[in-house]
Amino acid sequence: MFRAHWLYLSFGLAFVISCSPGDETPAPSATPEDVHAESWRESRMLAGQKIYEDVCASCHASGEEGAPILGDRAAWSGRSDLWTAVLAEHATAGYFDMPEKGGHGELTDDEVTAAMEYILLKTFPEKPRD
C-alpha cells in the first residue's frame, strides 16, 4: 500500500510538471518598423544591383581602366575607412578615369549611392550596413 501511494504520487507529480508552462518565453516578433526597414534594405539593394549591372559593370566587372572589380577584396581593401561617404563622393563626382556618375548624368545621387552600397555588400558582406 505504501509503495502504491508513492507510485501514484510520483506519476501525479510527473504529470503536473510535464503540463506546467515552464520558462518558455515566446520568440520576439518583428515590429512593423523592423519589417519596413528590412523591406527597404532589400529594395535598395535590388535597385543598386540593377544600376550596377546597367552602368557600373561595364568597368567594374572586368577591371577596365584599373577599376576595382566587384568582389575583389584586395582591390578594394586599400580604400578609406570612411567607405560610404568617400566612395559615394567618388562615384557621384567622378574619380581618376571614372566619369561622374559612371557617365550617366541622368542618375540621381541616391541611385549612385545605392549602386555603391551594392558593390560594398557584394565585396565585404560581413561589414555592418548603415
Predicted regions mapped to residue ranges:
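Sec-dependent bacterial lipoprotein signal peptides
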Residues: 1-17
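Bacterial signal peptide processing site
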Residues: 19-23
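Electrostatic cytochrome c docking/interface patches
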Residues: 25-50, 65-72
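Mobile acidic interaction elements
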Residues: 36-41, 57, 61, 83, ...
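Extracytoplasmic/secreted proteins, especially bacterial periplasmic and envelope-associated proteins
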Residues: 47, 51, 75, 86, ...
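The canonical Cys-X-X-Cys-His
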Residues: 52-62, 115, 119
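Gly/Gly-Pro-rich "capping" loops immediately C-terminal to redox-active cysteine motifs
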Residues: 58-89
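Axial heme c-ligation environment in periplasmic c-type cytochrome domains
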Residues: 69, 90-130
